[in-house]
UniProtKB/Swiss-Prot annotation:
Subunit and partners: Homodimer.
One GO cellular component term: cytosol
Record-linked Pfam families: DXP_synthase_N, Transket_pyr, Transketolase_C
Keywords: Isoprene biosynthesis, Magnesium, Metal-binding, Thiamine biosynthesis, Thiamine pyrophosphate, Transferase
Cofactor annotation remark: Binds 1 Mg(2+) ion per subunit.
Protein name: 1-deoxy-D-xylulose-5-phosphate synthase
Species for this entry: Clostridium acetobutylicum (strain ATCC 824 / DSM 792 / JCM 1419 / IAM 19013 / LMG 5710 / NBRC 13948 / NRRL B-527 / VKM B-1787 / 2291 / W)
Swiss-Prot/TrEMBL cofactor(s): Mg(2+); thiamine diphosphate
Pathway(s) served: Metabolic intermediate biosynthesis; 1-deoxy-D-xylulose 5-phosphate biosynthesis; 1-deoxy-D-xylulose 5-phosphate from D-glyceraldehyde 3-phosphate and pyruvate: step 1/1
E.C. no: 2.2.1.7
Gene that specifies this protein: dxs
Sites where the protein binds thiamine diphosphate: 74, 115-117, 147-148, 175, 285, 365
Recorded family membership: Belongs to the transketolase family. DXPS subfamily.
Residues involved in Mg(2+) binding: 146, 175
Length: 619
């Protein structure tokens, strides 16, 4: 089926390929990716954009000793194909299948695991310094996108390696930023001579000789100032040069000859160097080229039409976005903040209708939280929409800048609970634990999509920090639950009365608990169902009443058990000297792999059958 790909066996096979063969290979890889991802889902556009870049890196470097770190990691599919994992792509992102991100236990060619952005340069600097301490000899390459480069961690790492002159090669995969008009022929010429070792040696020798005399030193400094002024006008990489990192580029990221040539020369430069590569997301697939956001991370789709196979449904993200627009229409103090996740968090419509009150700060969660605190301190009602897994990056800002001052920031925590196919780095199963430990923080969760609107409207009217957590997708199992429309701080909703057993469920697990209740009635077990709308503070009055009536408690949450709501309930019952039995159902103290959500629930006994079995044994 594929002339080159079918016969490719080892990372060294690429070394002797001609430019024409590499171009044909690139075409085959694109066809392979489109075919496979259309059947499994995955990150398509970003991988189509780095085919030539990845081939060039593999051709120039010796992957049996050199280390490539892929920032974020979702653009590493081509790397996986070239490192012996082509035959596993039918299982991409499936349970026990090929991960969508680099995994050290998956291949010796995955030097470092990634998933969150802006980490690659820091990791590369650590690996490079370990190499130098051990007196080893290999290259360390960090591949980072223009979006990830906006992250504070990436800038911190650049500052460090530029100052310390750490020998690291950085590939800036730029698929979005525009290049100013003055970056043209002059820039190309300057890059050409800066790549020439004779030029670099001559420049160093001239400066050394000039500095031997007082007059020469002044001349040398003047030349440096003049040269710096010219470069400032014509070279977009001046920022990198100023902090001590050699800048090369920009170059065409789809021109294999130019890529291999410049990468080879970058390899010879001592000290940190950044190569600016211009690529196109979705390259080679017209639908992805026209709509790269849609194909950034997509489910199964028809490769001939580009249309998704599953029909879109009402989701929590859409409900949140709709609620934000409605609230903003009635309250000009409401502002929305996102960290480069406008589409994912459902804020597209808000950004268009209220551009002055919409802030996309880039991949800067720490900055986003403290900026929200500043807005709240001056009378505005900031809502920070963020994935659960990414809010982890701003824990100190939540604690130090928001909660100590008890500022009314609303955290709209999307993708809470397990998210499935993206695996360990993206499962949102820690937010209850890390937020419940912070004084002045209130945590809420809607039991259904429809309830989120009412919670958001209530939350923005309060004068203290509130986190509202909700899952990926839409209603879990049942869509017949009526949303709670009025809330009292720290009070739960009793959905069903019962005997002997009280199930306290959080968020989407409430719908699951309702189905479990119906199943358990067949075994003569009549459970009360409590919707823990407030995770913190817990409803102590309701707990006390059920405890005094000698109920056993079953707590179901989509969070790790350590520090979850079950822990809060146990702590309260212990403080009150109650002896009621408590069964906590949640996730173990381990990182949760990738796979279909229902398969993962079954793995942890959080599917309907598993929950029923645990309660029957407990009863």
């Amino acid at each position: 089926m594929y002339n080159i790909l079918d016969n490719y066996e080892d990372v060294d096979d690429i070394k002797n390929m001609s430019s024409d063969e590499l171009k044909e290979f690139a075409s085959e890889i694109r066809k392979f990716l489109i075919d496979k991802i259309s059947k499994t889902g995955g990150h398509l556009a970003s991988n189509l954009g780095v085919v030539e870049l990845t081939l060039s890196l593999h051709k120039v470097f010796n992957l049996k000793k050199d280390k490539i770190i892929w920032d974020v990691g979702h653009q590493a599919y081509v790397h996986k194909i070239l490192t012996g994992r082509k035959d596993k792509f039918d299982s991409l992102k499936q349970f026990n299948g090929l991960s969508g991100f680099p995994k050290r236990n998956e291949s010796i060619y995955d030097a470092f695991e990634t998933g969150h952005s802006s980490t690659s340069i820091s990791a590369a600097s650590g690996i490079a310094r370990a190499r130098d301490l051990s007196k080893d000899n290999y290259d360390v390459i960090a591949v980072i996108g223009d979006g990830a480069l906006t992250g504070g961690m990436a800038l911190e790492a650049l500052n460090d390696i530029g100052y310390k002159k750490t020998n690291v090669i950085i590939i800036l995969n730029d698929n979005q930023m525009s290049i100013a008009k003055n970056v043209g022929s002059i820039s190309k010429y300057l890059n050409k001579i800066r790549l020439d070792p004779k030029y670099n040696k001559l420049k160093k020798d001239v400066k050394t000789k000039l500095q031997r005399t007082n007059i020469g030193s002044e001349v040398a400094n003047s030349i440096e100032r003049i040269k710096g002024g010219i470069k400032q006008m014509v070279v977009s990489g001046m920022f990198f040069e100023d902090i001590g990192i050699k800048y090369l580029g920009p170059i065409d990221g789809h021109n294999i000859e130019e890529l291999t040539s410049v990468i080879s020369k970058a390899k010879e430069i001592k000290g940190p160097v950044i190569l600016h590569v211009k690529t196109q997301k979705g390259k080679g697939y017209s639908y992805a080229e026209e709509n790269p956001n849609k194909f950034h991370s997509i489910g199964k789709f028809n490769s001939k039409t580009g249309e998704a196979l599953s029909k879109p449904k009402d989701t929590y993200s859409k409900a949140f976005g709709k609620a934000m627009v409605q609230m903003a229409e009635n309250n000009d103090k409401i502002v929305a903040i996102t960290a480069a996740m406008t589409d994912g968090t459902g804020l597209c419509e808000f950004s268009k209708k209220f551009p002055q009150r919409f802030f996309d700060v880039g991949i800067s969660e720490q900055h986003a939280v403290t900026m929200a605190a500043g807005l709240a301190a001056t009378g505005y009602k900031p809502v920070f929409a963020v994935y659960s897994t990414f809010l982890q990056r701003a824990y100190d800002q939540v604690l130090h800048d928001v909660c100590i001052q008890k500022l009314p920031v609303v955290f709209a925590i999307d993708r809470a609970g397990i998210v499935g196919e993206d695996g360990e780095t993206h499962q949102g199963v820690f937010d209850i634990s890390y937020l419940s430990s912070i004084p002045n923080m209130t945590i809420m969760a809607p039991k259904c999509v429809e309830e989120l609107n009412y919670i958001m409207n209530w939350a923005v009217k309060q004068n203290y920090p509130i986190a509202v957590r909700y899952p990926k997708g839409g209603n879990d199992i049942s869509d017949v639950l009526a949303p709670l429309k009025e809330f009292r701080h720290g009070k739960w909703e009793i959905l069903k009365d019962g005997k002997d057993v009280a199930i306290v469920a959080v968020g989407k697990m409430v719908q699951r608990a309702m189905v479990v209740r119906d199943e358990l009635l067949k075994y003569g077990i009549d459970c009360a169902i409590i919707n823990a709308t407030f995770i913190k503070p817990i409803d102590k009055d309701t707990l006390n009443r059920f405890a005094r009536d000698n109920y056993k408690f079953v707590v179901i949450e989509d969070n790790v058990l350590h520090g979850g709501i079950g822990s809060l309930i146990l702590e309260h019952l212990n403080d009150m000297k109650f002896k009621n039995d408590v069964l906590n159902l949640g996730f173990k103290d381990e990182f949760i792999t990738h796979g279909n959500i229902e398969i993962l629930y079954k793995l942890y006994d959080l599917d309907i059958e598993g929950i029923c079995k645990r309660i029957i044994s407990f009863k």
